[in-house]
Each structure stands twice: as structure tokens, then as C-alpha cells.
A protein has these predicted regions:
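Structured helix-beta-strand junction loops
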Residues: 33-35, 71, 107, 125
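Short, well-structured N-terminal submotif of metal-dependent ribonuclease cores
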Residues: 1-39, 55-60, 140, 146-147
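Short amphipathic alpha-helical segments and helix-helix/interface helices
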Residues: 25-28, 100-101, 119
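Alpha-helical elements of the RecA-like P-loop NTPase motor core of helicases
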Residues: 11, 50, 120
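Acidic, PIN/NYN-like endoribonuclease modules and their adjacent C-terminal/linker elements
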Residues: 1, 107-110, 114-147
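Active-site neighborhoods of divalent-metal-dependent phosphate/nucleic-acid chemistry enzymes
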Residues: 73-117, 146
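Alpha-helix N-cap/helix-start capping motif
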Residues: 7, 42, 78-81, 115-116, ...
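Active-site-proximal, substrate-binding regions of enzyme catalytic domains
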Residues: 21, 25, 39-86
């Protein structure tokens, strides 16, 4: 099971940097081809919409977000609050990161992120996490190993 940080999805949707885009899309394709279960905190909808709205029209943003939501399992705020609160207290991470890390913890998932600080905090919280930009090969090997 996988939790993808918003950064991975943004890199896949908007190719600001060709290398980040390639890595993100390859990981998404592998997750799809292996039919791996993806969990996301419901806050993803707001965060992803906010980022994409800076670069795309409302209509396109809504379409992107709706398409992603069709393929993931959203975990409600209430289900993650206590875990996210504990993670925030133990790591000092950003609030939104605490929800993604908490989602990985609650669903026993691997966290994938293009945010190095988030990955560091996830590891402090005992979560298996991969920094996509520098641990791409290790992540691909790990995903391939999942039955």
C-alpha cells in the first residue's frame, strides 16, 4: 500500500522539471500496472487543488483532482487527527505533512514524496518512506518487490 505526497502528483501533472516529471510519472505508471492500493488523506483534495490552481484553470484543476480521487482511497480527517497530532508533536513537522505521514502510519503504507524534509520526518515516525528525487532506484526496486 502506498501514500503519495502531493508533491509527487504535482510533478506528474505539471512538468516544471523534466527529471522530476519523468520520475513521478514512472512511479505512477508502476503503481497502476501493479494495481497497488493507494491511500491519501482527504486533505489532498484541497492541497492539490490549491497548487494546481496557480497554473491551470479551475475546470482543468477540478478534472485532474476528480480523476485522481477516482483511483485512490481517501482517509477522512477524523480518522487521522490523533495520529497526525502525535506525529506533529514528536517530529515538529508541518501540519499537512503530519497528515500524509499519519495516513501512511494508519494504513501501513509506504510514503513516497518529493519533499526531503517530509521523508526525514516520516522516518523519525517509523514510516517506510522514499525521497523520490534521490531514492528513485531504491523505490522502483521496492515497488517491483511488492507482490
Amino acid at each position: 500500500m502506498i501514500v503519495l505526497d502531493t508533491s509527487v502528483l504535482v510533478d506528474a501533472i505539471i512538468p516544471f522539471d523534466s527529471e522530476r516529471h519523468r520520475k513521478s510519472t514512472t512511479v505512477l505508471e508502476m503503481i497502476s500496472s501493479k494495481e497497488l492500493v493507494v491511500f491519501e488523506p482527504k486533505l489532498l483534495v484541497v492541497e492539490l487543488s490549491a497548487v494546481l490552481a496557480r497554473y491551470r484553470s479551475r475546470h482543468i484543476v477540478v478534472n485532474h483532482v476528480n480523476e485522481i480521487v477516482r483511483h485512490v482511497n481517501l482517509v477522512e480527517y477524523e480518522e487521522l487527527h490523533e495520529t497526525a497530532f502525535d506525529i506533529a508533536l514528536s517530529t515538529g513537522c508541518r501540519a499537512i505533512d503530519a497528515f500524509f505521514i499519519g495516513c501512511a502510519k494508519e494504513t501501513n503504507s509506504i510514503l513516497v514524496s518529493s519533499d526531503k524534509i517530509q521523508v526525514s520526518n516520516a522516518r523519525k515516525a517509523g514510516i517506510e518512506a522514499y525521497y523520490l528525487l534521490e531514492e528513485y532506484d531504491e523505490l522502483l526496486a521496492r515497488l517491483k518487490a511488492i507482490a
